[in-house]
Amino acid sequence: MKDLLKFLKQQNQTEDFDGIRIGLASPDLVRSWSFGEVKKPETINYRTFKPERDGLFCARIFGPVKDYECLCGKYKRLKHRGVICEKCGVEVTLTKVRRDRMGHIELASPVAHIWFLKSLPSRIGLLLDMTLRDIERVLYFESYVVTEPGMTTLEKSQILTEEEYLDALEEHGDEFDALMGAEAVLALLQQIDLDGEVAQMREELPEIGSETKRKKITKRLKLMEAFAASGNKPEWMIMNVLPILPPDLRPLVPLDGGRFATSDLNDLYRRVINRNNRLKRLLDLVAPDIIVRNEKRMLQESVDALLDNGRRGRAITGSNKRPLKSLADMIKGKQGRFRQNLLGKRVDYSGRSVITVGPTLKLHQCGLPKKMALELFKPFIYGKLEARGLATTIKAAKKLVEREGAEVWDVLDEVIREHPVMLNRAPTLHRLGIQAFEPVLIEGKAIHLHPLVCAAYNADFDGDQMAVHVPLTIEAQMEARTLMMSTNNVLAPANGEPIIVPSQDVVLGLYYLTRFRINGLGEGMYFTDEKEVEKAYRTGVAELHARIKVRITEHVKNADGEWEPVTKLRDTTVGRAIMWQVCPKGLPYDLIDKPLGKKPISKLINHAYRNLGLKETVMFADQIMYTGFHYAMIAGCSVGIDDMVIPEAKYTIVEDSEAEVAEIQAQFDQGLVTAGEKYNKVIDIWSSANEKVSKAMMDNLSKEMVMNRDGEMEEQDSFNSIFMMADSGARGSAAQIRQLAGMRGLMAKPDGSIIETPIKANFREGLTVLQYFISTHGARKGLADTALKTANSGYLTRRLVDVAQDLVVTNHDCGTHDGLLMTPLIEGGDVVEPLRERVLGRVVCDDVLIPGTDEVLLPRNTLIDEALCDVIEDNSVDQIKVRSIITCKTDFGICANCYGRDLARGHMINQGEAIGVVAAQSIGEPGTQLTMRTFHIGGAASRATAESSVQVKNTGTLKLQNAKFVTNSEKHLVITSRSSELTIIDEMGREKERYKVPYGSVLSKNDGEAVNSGDTIANWDPHTHPIITEVAGKVQFVDLADGVTMVRQTDELTGLSSIVITDAAQRNATGKEMRPALKLVDAKGKEVMIAGTEIPALYYLPGNAIVNLEDGADVGVGDALARIPQASSKTRDITGGLPRVADLFEARKPKLPAILAEKTGVVAFGKETKGKVRLLITQPSGEVYEEMIPKTRLLNIYEGEPVIKGEVIADGPESPHDILRLRGVAPVANYIVNEVQEVYRLQGVKINDKHIEVIVRQMIRKCEILDAGDSTFLKGEQVEVARVNISNRELEAEGKQPAEYEMQMMGITKASLATESFISAASFQETTRVLTEAAVAGKKDGLRGLKENVIVGRLIPAGTGYSYHQERARRKAAALAPAVESTVSADDAEKALTDALNSDLLSGNH
């Protein structure tokens, strides 16, 4: 028996490995794998069903068909194990070996491997330096190639057609060798001397001038070096021996009725064997050349089809006209090996059923149907029954369970006690899609689900199904209980806010409970405590909404951290006093002393979690739910048609709007306004009408007048059911009520433009046929959008997960002093996100000082929590430098301090947390809520009116940021710089508002002056761009020739004439050379210099500029010399929603990107060419940088203006690549974070910035080498930044020259494919290309990410698997240590020993 066990043990031992290498297989290697050559195309005998000898299923080669039984039946049973039968030649062993024994085919002529030939760039082509076209012509026997030119005029690897070959033969005889087919390519590949070629190219590289040639040589050099380093030989890309897959991996299954189901591979192998055998026969017969050639070509084609069907020519089809599935198809795509079997497997001990509500469950419970539980827990039940002695054998136990006797249910109850099960709802978009619960047995067939976890699962009870999984091992049960239990997942990982929040009925019930009603039954009564209030309510003395006075006892923490009761009489309502009974002690009463809608309840739970801990919060949440359901029932809020009250004002508003529209129509008919203007105005009118109606409706619905106790009328919130549902946040919104009781408003056409005639009716009045027809389009589009959106959103999530999957918290602190500077996010004067929300849960990078002093408020490396946020606000700190994922210096992974708080748990993040996947899920999960379409903007639907002034909202002090200005004659400031911003600072020194002010704005206040709320402090003309003079003097025209560079226009109404500069393109030859400008001179005619410089005041005028001055006119400082009309900003389609997020993460370059200044210096314009402007920037060092810019771009800069590197010089959307190159890592991170957040914010989705930063970090992990220094990198090579940093540290330690690099940004798809792990990349996309590249380079996968480890079937190096990997790494280091013991000093050894002992004691291994 022992022997047997030993034998079985050694069967499945896998070597303990640390990496996987992929390479090319040499013919000898293939033969060494093989157990014999397959000579016949036969599979099995159709009569006996036994495999044919030497065929594709041959038992002699691949192993026996039955366990321990040879084919002819001479040897059976275990005792003959290992014997080889002399009759049929089959080894007596397990039939399992048919899964791993390979065979081979000896090919009669060599064949090229299609992957290395056709997968672009063609590896064979690169090595031989021939085009793919030529190689294919040689391989498929269309032309000859010279392999040995000898003493002739021919070149090596020259292509010869049939005629040229014959001519050459006549001329040179057998001086030279030329071959065709794979033999020729094989000969050429064998002749390559890798080391020689590499050395030669390394020498040539520095001398090469042309960029394209250099790139080509670099590519070829990289490939050659890869071959040399990996030990692969180029000739192995041509095969002499073809391996054959083990037969059980390409099965042949007899169906009933004498037919067979077979894997496509067998067909493909049969073709290869047939052609190979035919070719052998032809070669033996010495057949004519042309026949042999044809047969060789067919062999090549059949091997191509076997390896990758359809890559070349038409795919080979089977009997059913479908292309056969080749080896390459087996591994790629969603149905391939990687995604179908390795990354996603089916599991046993699982069941699924419909879900229904379990309103009586506790949060940690779920209802499990008895039938299901019995089936799922069978093995446990059998075990228990045997242990109890109720059954003697498993068979008996089985019978008992099938009878379902009483004792079985008792045992089942015991078995499931405290044995958590996991519930999962597809689609699992984030980690809360699988949670653990304790099962409670129920009758019926539906799983009962606790209502509060529905938000996390995104589940509802309209027929959703869920799956149940049973964790079997004790470790699995422990993890399920400690990590996955629903009670441990109160906060959402995406934003750290509670996700266990009531919704719908519960909210409505609590809202109803905590509302007040004027003059309710029992108003004005006094009560001693909340229990007495409930008594009064139950006996019917007071109603729920009555306003009363009660003594309320709160518990407050004192200085020692003890709870102290504080009692006082409060004005409140009966319902709120009842609500107070379920609140745990330690909550402030103010939190529930208001009508509880969805937001206040969320705040309540959040407060409880942060201040009272997890256990209290969970119990409180359950109580809230029970209470909410109960009072929702009592309230009986239902909707009747009378609840939709149509406002009286609606009809007058509609009539007025109709009159206005008629007026505009009349103007249009007279030709006073254009069709476009009419359209926009009409749409504006109806939009505002709609707003007015809905405002009137809401005012009407939300308030009602009632008589109070004193007989006077008093206003109170309405008890209208529809209003209560919307106001509490239970269901519905103002927009939906508007359609029910206001007017439906404007509708969109199929192309997205808005129809001028609105739907004036609402649903209560009913729609006419035409109105109904107009509105159907939008409704259907919504459904179509949803379907597309789901797929797109899922694909985005998949890409995000793939790029971030290997990012794990690996150490506690990387010690960096870099970080991001956080300020409040301010848009158009509103604080969109205050500072506290941006720094909450982050770690301070440098000491935070109290503003205006040197006193330290927060020391470095402090984690900012809610309490510290209050401290920051009290001390009015307005910016903090915090640690960030982007600037973390850990090489592979990230440190806890740079990440900060674990949002789902509320404390510092633990080591081993898989933050990459969490980030990807947090960004991807709300993807389905984003819109799909790009917004076509029509009318006022959302067209921003051109802004022309700044009006402040807060009182404070005006501060100008990076602004240059002059003071004009009226003592106003005029801005003369491009990217100026104006901020309002409150008395605490905090920034409250921020506005962009364009060039030429006139300010009514000076820098540092006090402003009051409502002041207009800046004005400008939005439709023209002025040219402002910075000095006073007389205007002198330069190059302004009437009819050449300018024309005069006279305004018909005013009679004023103005000069318009003609566009350069429309001038004649002399005019093209002239550059019209305005020069300022003093009274004597001398040039005036710009203040403080030696630059004369000369202002160039671009085409279309309008000058309202005459030659010699006097101007003062800050006056406008000319105006450049701005084309009215066309309503650009803003790409919104999902496509925008995808564009940002894919780092796509926008269509017409903004042009940024490449260098810092002074701008000048050089000679213009056709269609382009030459821009010169003179740097402080005196160097001149020049760049050509298309004339179509409107430049924001004028001659002589200083610019800073990275400043915008032509407007447009900025390209992230430019921002990274010119401004650095932090600005590009900020840009992407803010742009992505903007999309999510529009939909009201909250995501923490950290998650987006994680993805950005993964996008900038590669860099391009600018100067290799003493490193082994090549110039222009793309390498992981971490690799360069490691190598640079080593080089610096040796005192050598480190490599210089420039950060590169890659889109997420590209970054995923460029990861160091080829297994991860291959399982993502483009499997063939990734594997081809990896094989040629002989890459080794170190199995560092999560995906690679899942694929090879290990614990992942994150979460609870993190320690396992740490331990393995430690053991490995320990195993390697003795090799270098000669250099260890005694002290070191002693220290190491103590460390080891201590760590053992700490980890409890004693």
Curated annotation (Swiss-Prot):
Respond yes or no to whether keyword Amino-acid biosynthesis is given for this record: no
Give the reaction(s) catalysed.
RNA(n) + a ribonucleoside 5'-triphosphate = RNA(n+1) + diphosphate
Residues the record lists as binding Mg(2+) = D460, D462, D464
Q: Give me the residues that bind Zn(2+) 2, please.
A: C814, C888, C895, C898
- Write down the NCBIfam families for this protein, in alphabetical order: rpoC_TIGR
Names of required cofactors:
Mg(2+); Zn(2+)
Organism annotation: Colwellia psychrerythraea (strain 34H / ATCC BAA-681)
What is this organism's lineage?
Bacteria, Pseudomonadati, Pseudomonadota, Gammaproteobacteria, Alteromonadales
State the top-level EC class: transferase
Q: Which residues bind Zn(2+) 1?
A: C70, C72, C85, C88
Which keywords, in A-to-Z order, does the entry hold? DNA-directed RNA polymerase, Magnesium, Metal-binding, Nucleotidyltransferase, Transcription, Transferase, Zinc
Which SUPFAM superfamilies does the annotation name? beta and beta-prime subunits of DNA dependent RNA-polymerase
**Entry similarity comment:** Belongs to the RNA polymerase beta' chain family.
For this record, an example GO cellular component is: DNA-directed RNA polymerase complex
Q: How does it assemble?
A: The RNAP catalytic core consists of 2 alpha, 1 beta, 1 beta' and 1 omega subunit. When a sigma factor is associated with the core the holoenzyme is formed, which can initiate transcription.
Q: How is the cofactor bound?
A: Binds 1 Mg(2+) ion per subunit. Binds 2 Zn(2+) ions per subunit.
The Swiss-Prot or TrEMBL record annotates one GO molecular function as: magnesium ion binding
Q: What does this protein do?
A: DNA-dependent RNA polymerase catalyzes the transcription of DNA into RNA using the four ribonucleoside triphosphates as substrates.
Q: What is its EC number?
A: 2.7.7.6
Tell me, which GO biological process terms does this entry list?
A: DNA-templated transcription
Q: What is this protein called?
A: DNA-directed RNA polymerase subunit beta'
